Curated annotation (Swiss-Prot):
Record keyword Disulfide bond present: yes
Protein name, UniProt field: Portal protein
Tagged with keyword Disulfide bond: yes
Cellular localisation: Virion; Host nucleus
Main location: virion
Region ranges (Disordered): 376-405, 459-480, 622-678
Gene field: UL6
Gene Ontology process terms (BP): chromosome organization
InterPro entries: Herpes_Portal
Pfam families the UniProt entry points to: Herpes_UL6
HAMAP family assigned: HSV_PORTL
Length: 678
């Protein structure tokens, strides 16, 4: 997407300047245009949002700029301290707590020399930690003065990144003034109590104060233009940029970090959104097409057919299904009465002649005869079984012949009864079948006629609706491809000719065709992530298992984007040394510790601590015996200079003469204050 040529009207500032720019001079309006406004909409998620686009939340985070500002203020304050101020604060602390070397030695005179030195080191470490914490609180208050407006303020770092991501340039409006940041910083330095209590803080505030005030003025005097209320013009002949606020009429300057390309009639920006815009628009169009298909596309109607195999159709297949359901297949061969009765019914259904009844029933009775007539369960001696009684005069018969005759008689009676019943039933069925066949033939003829009429009516109605739709769309000859598509949506699929007696419709449904765009979304997500990570030099942090834990600015990103923000956008007088990528993820106290170790104050504290421990160790040494008059006469010289030198060397540096009062830490000066030993 590129900025199209637009007519730049002649504009005047509120001060009554001459014509700002004219079309004949080669000025072209490059923002706002439909293309540049689309960039901002894309960045806000109006064209969709993907997982890879979430990296931009880290890119526009102000964490790196905040850490750079904190490091600059910490460096300015700590490097503004002097050895004299630090020594004075330490001397006051020693006198206030009575920690002079002589007093420490007298207090711990029974301790070993190493223990006394350890006490001295501990005493100084306590004061050093207290001083460091006090200075951190003071520096934290100074940093708070530079955060007016928060993330949405006029000089916010996220707004700076938004401009670079969309256009690769930043329009800046400047007006020198003392605003909220300057007023807050001045009031803080005047009203804080620490400068009146510690010489170190007072000296640091006095020396670093002017530079900090200049930095605050730079924050107050700079305002980055809002994306939707600024006009940007470009003159290719002169290579100049012009920025103007259409509401206030204020003119500004344009910081071009990534120079665009002028193609003769348009400007192609060098920015991440410019490079991703074609892919984003194409993917968005595909999603819109899928949504339209979801709403209006009704083709195609699909019919699912199911057909049995030849071995599973007919009576044999039904018998096999029944056998399997009742457990009467070849594998099980169960002998339940229900299965035998069902098999009898199925065999009777499969009979082709009336004479088959006798064979079917006899087969059933042979299979179930032993169960229907159980010989032990029937008493043949009872009345009703012929001459089976055991009365006198009766001749005993063969025991096996009687049950066999009974079974034959039972089978004959059953077959005769079934034959008589079925003959009458079959005769009635034959008559009914003939009557239904005649009726069915007439109904089939009528149904075919009605079906033909219905098809003709549907075809005519569909053609009329299609013609009406074509006329409403501007004529049928204008867009033949779309007309064919609309007709295809109403195609009727006839599957009646593909079906026979053994075929049935198992399911039918209407399927909406929706184009798949999942792969396009995944590709766009990877493009977003790749472009943002590579363009802004984002650093990934991983654990030992290779899993990503966080992402942050690298040292290259700080040099490429954070440094120009302070140097060219804010025009900060003292931005200090650039932080590294590892410093970005540090907390405020951790950053303070890292900066503290690199400043001169750390060196001063190390030196003062070494001198204090040395004085304590020197005071703990045993004192030499007092010299006698003979010693003085033996070592005296004719001029008396040797006596003076011997007397001077008998005293240790930093120790008072024997019997003299302890004046504090070091040698007494003329004004009564002790000299600090260096």
């Amino acid at each position: 997407m590129a900025a199209q040529r637009a007519r730049a009207p002649a504009m005047r500032t509120r001060g009554g300047d001459a014509a700002l720019c004219a079309p004949e001079d080669g000025w072209v309006k490059v923002h706002p245009t439909p293309g540049t406004m689309l960039f901002r909409e894309i960045l806000l998620g109006q064209m969709g949002y993907t997982e890879g686009q979430g990296v931009y939340n880290v890119v526009r985070s102000s964490e790196a700029a905040t850490r750079q500002l904190q490091a600059a203020i910490f460096h300015a304050l700590l490097n503004a301290t002097t050895y004299r101020d630090l020594e004075e604060d330490w001397r006051r602390h020693v006198v206030a707590r009575g920690l002079q070397p002589q007093r420490l030695v007298r207090r711990y005179r029974n301790a070993r020399e190493g223990d006394i030195a350890g006490v001295a080191e501990r005493v100084f470490d306590t004061w050093r930690c207290t001083l460091r914490t006090t200075l951190l609180d003071f520096a934290h208050g100074v940093v708070d003065c530079f955060a007016p407006g928060g993330p949405s303020g006029p000089t916010s770092f996220p707004k700076y990144i938004d401009w670079l991501t969309c256009l690769g340039l930043v329009p800046i409006l400047r007006k020198t003034r003392e605003g909220e940041a300057t007023q807050r910083l001045g009031a803080f330095l005047r009203q804080h109590t620490l400068p009146r209590q510690l010489a170190t803080v007072a000296g640091a505030a006095e020396r670093a104060g002017p530079g900090l005030l200049d930095l605050a003025v730079a924050f107050d005097s700079t305002r980055m233009a809002e994306y939707d209320r600024v006009h940007i013009y470009y003159n290719h002949r002169r290579g100049e940029w012009l920025v103007r606020d259409p509401v206030s009429g204020q003119r500004g300057e344009c910081l071009v970090l990534c120079p665009p390309l002028w193609t003769g009639d348009r400007l192609v920006f060098d920015s991440p959104v410019q490079r991703l815009c074609p892919e984003i628009v194409a993917c968005h169009a595909l999603r819109e097409h899928a949504h339209i298909c979801r709403l209006r596309n009704t083709a195609s109607v699909k019919v699912l057919l199911g057909r049995k195999s030849d071995s599973e159709r007919g009576v044999a297949g039904a018998a096999r299904v029944v056998n399997k359901a009742l457990g009467e297949d070849d594998e099980t061969k169960a002998g339940s009465a229900a299965s035998r009765l069902v098999r009898l019914i199925i065999n009777m259904k499969g009979m082709r002649h009336v004479g088959d009844i006798n064979d079917t029933v006899r087969a059933y009775l042979d299979e179930a005869g032993g169960h229907l007539i159980d010989t032990p369960a029937v008493d043949h001696t009872l009345p009703g079984f012929g001459k089976g009684g055991t009365g006198r005069g009766s001749r005993p018969q063969d025991p096996g012949a009687r049950p066999q005759q009974l079974r034959q008689a039972f089978q004959t009676a059953v077959v005769n009864n079934i034959n008589g019943m079925l003959e009458g039933y079959i005769n009635n069925l034959f008559g009914t079948i003939e009557r239904l066949r005649e009726t069915n033939a007439g109904l089939a003829t009528q149904l075919q006629a009605r079906d033909r009429e219905l098809r003709r009516a549907q075809a005519g109605a569909l053609e009329r609706e299609q013609r009406a739709a074509d006329r409403a769309a501007g004529g049928g000859a204008g867009r033949p491809a779309e007309a064919d598509l609309l007709r295809a949506d109403y195609d009727i699929i006839d599957v009646s000719k593909s079906m026979d007696d053994d075929t049935y419709v198992a399911n039918s449904f209407q399927h909406q065709y929706i184009p798949a765009y999942g792969q396009d979304l995944e590709r766009l997500s990877r493009l977003w992530e790749h472009e943002l990570v590579r363009c802004f030099k984002i650093l990934r942090h991983r654990n030992k298992q290779g899993q990503e834990t966080s992402i942050s600015y690298s040292s290259g990103a700080i040099a490429s984007f954070v440094a120009p923000y302070f140097e060219y956008v804010l025009r900060a007088p003292r931005a200090g040394a650039l932080i590294t990528g590892s410093d970005v993820i540090l907390g405020e106290e951790e950053l303070w510790e890292a900066v503290f170790k690199k400043t001169r104050l750390q060196t001063y504290l190390t030196d003062v601590a070494a001198l204090f421990v040395a004085d304590v160790q020197h005071a703990a040494l045993p004192r030499p015996p007092s010299p006698t008059p003979a010693d003085f006469r033996a070592s005296a010289s004719p001029r008396g200079g040797s006596r003076s030198r011997t007397r001077t060397r008998s005293r240790s540096p930093g120790r008072t003469p024997r019997g003299a009062p302890d004046q504090g830490w070091g040698v007494e000066r003329r004004d009564g204050r002790p000299h600090a030993r260096r």
